[in-house]
């Protein structure tokens, strides 16, 4: 490893180390939200709510592709960071090679089992009438790009795992920048509508994945793309999948939750789906910034779990304080100019009113949601596979009954409030799990929460 990477892992001031690892991730996730918003923003100029709904309905599929990337990216990435903390550099080459080609194989399987059934999958997602064909066309492009989307998530995690967060950010910047350029060209110039939006995202992911491959081939002595090293053994599989499977389940259940939510919203009409799609993109700004903060420090936590547990504790305290500051700023913004923010995407006043309401409700859960992100990251970083698995299952198990109960009692308003209730319960569950495992983490969780 390079001396600079070791410096941030071991010696730099905690806040400086946190920002070194997290800031590129925060910027990258923020930019990814921007091009997600731009898809809807550009499509919004066509003044067709069916197209906005089509893009919104595909969110669960993207969550599943992200989950497949996390299966190897998070699982192998945290393992690589622990190996580096233990100074076992050679083993990381075998871990990375197996994960890269495993991810590509998964992507090819996705194409084979989904592409012939894109119409049926669109219907399952809740697409009806005019929205059905639009959603199906968007999905076809997503499925064809699956190997590169999965590979992008894996390689981006590896860049952070080895202490090169700036490379991670550059890769994401390249992807976002290219997508911003391609969207208007493909949507308007070639008159491809939602297919143009999907193609812009797909091409951008291909370019970013190729960037990471070239970087690792030329610059890394701990991550290998040599297929000859893709030889797993029992220990490697155990270490990768005990964290990778919970990360995968978390994304899959997030996608399943999105599917169930879409079905509930579809019952209340196209305006409900479009309203949620707009508010979801706006909530993603602070949510993914916080997620970037929490995911960014996972390699730092994983490394110091092996090398310096006192430093690990200081990192966690700094992250909690940062989450609190972000929460306060975002709440002020949403409750003062939220209506104007939503108005950027549509002139339909019914959608503006509903999306603003959803935005305020979901933003309220940001603080506990952020704590949940952090504690889930701690479980992943420290190799607590059982705790991470329980947390992943709970995230899916909690939201479904809450949705059914709130919908039965309060209708559409209940569906919206169920998001806040479920997020809060998940965060409390994460805090409880970390507290119960505190001896293994050697972190006094109650002290962190109080201090």
Swiss-Prot record:
Multidrug resistance efflux protein. This is Multidrug export protein MepA. Belongs to the multi antimicrobial extrusion (MATE) (TC 2.A.66.1) family. MepA subfamily. It is a multi-pass membrane protein. PANTHER family: MULTIDRUG EXPORT PROTEIN MEPA, SPORULATION PROTEIN YKVU. The lineage of its organism: Bacteria, Bacillati, Bacillota, Bacilli, Bacillales. InterPro entries: MATE_fam, MATE_MepA-like, MATE_MepA_subfamily, MdtK-like. It comes from Staphylococcus aureus (strain MSSA476). It comes from the Bacteria. Keywords: Antibiotic resistance, Cell membrane, Membrane, Transmembrane, Transmembrane helix, Transport.
């Amino acid at each position: 490893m390079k001396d600079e990477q070791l410096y941030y892992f071991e010696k730099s001031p905690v806040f400086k180390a946190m920002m070194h690892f997290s800031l590129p991730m925060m910027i990258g996730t923020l930019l990814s939200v921007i091009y997600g918003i731009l898809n809807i923003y550009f499509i919004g100029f066509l003044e067709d709510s069916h197209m906005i709904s089509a893009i919104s309905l595909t969110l669960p599929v993207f969550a599943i592709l992200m989950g497949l990337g996390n299966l190897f990216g998070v699982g192998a990435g945290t393992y690589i960071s622990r190996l580096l903390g233990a100074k076992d550099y050679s083993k990381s080459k075998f871990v990375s090679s197996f994960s890269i080609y495993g991810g590509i194989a998964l992507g090819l399987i996705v194409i084979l089992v989904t592409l012939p059934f894109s119409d049926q999958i669109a219907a399952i997602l809740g697409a009806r009438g005019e929205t059905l064909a639009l959603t199906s066309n968007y999905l076809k492009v997503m499925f064809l790009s699956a190997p590169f989307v999965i590979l992008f998530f894996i390689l981006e995690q590896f860049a952070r795992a080895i202490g090169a967060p700036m490379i991670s950010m550059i890769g994401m910047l390249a992807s976002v920048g290219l997508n911003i350029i391609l969207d208007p060209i493909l949507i308007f110039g070639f008159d491809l509508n939602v297919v143009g939006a999907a193609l812009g995202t797909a091409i951008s992911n291909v370019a970013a994945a190729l960037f990471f491959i070239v970087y690792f081939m030329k610059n890394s002595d701990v991550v290998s793309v040599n297929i000859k090293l893709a030889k797993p053994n029992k220990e490697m599989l155990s270490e990768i999948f005990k964290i990778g499977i919970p990360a995968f389940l978390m994304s899959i259940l997030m996608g399943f939750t999105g599917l169930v939510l879409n079905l509930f919203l579809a019952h209340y009409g196209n305006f409900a789906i479009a309203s949620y799609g707009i508010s979801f993109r706006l909530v993603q700004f602070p949510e993914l910034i916080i997620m970037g903060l929490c995911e960014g420090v996972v390699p730092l936590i994983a490394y110091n779990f092996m090398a310096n547990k006192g430093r690990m504790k200081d990192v966690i305290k700094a992250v909690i304080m940062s989450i609190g500051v972000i929460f306060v700023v975002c709440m002020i913004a949403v409750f003062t100019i939220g209506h104007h923010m939503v108005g950027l995407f549509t002139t339909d006043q019914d959608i503006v009113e509903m999306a603003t309401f959803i935005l305020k409700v979901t933003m309220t859960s940001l603080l506990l949601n952020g704590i949940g992100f952090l504690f889930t990251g701690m479980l992943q970083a420290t190799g607590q596979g059982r705790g991470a698995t329980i947390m992943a299952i709970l995230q899916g198990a909690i939201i479904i009954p809450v949705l059914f109960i709130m919908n039965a009692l309060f209708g559409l308003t209940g569906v919206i409030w169920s998001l806040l209730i479920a997020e809060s319960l998940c965060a409390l569950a994460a805090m409880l799990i970390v507290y119960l495992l505190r001896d293994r983490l050697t972190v006094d969780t109650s002290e962190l929460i109080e201090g």
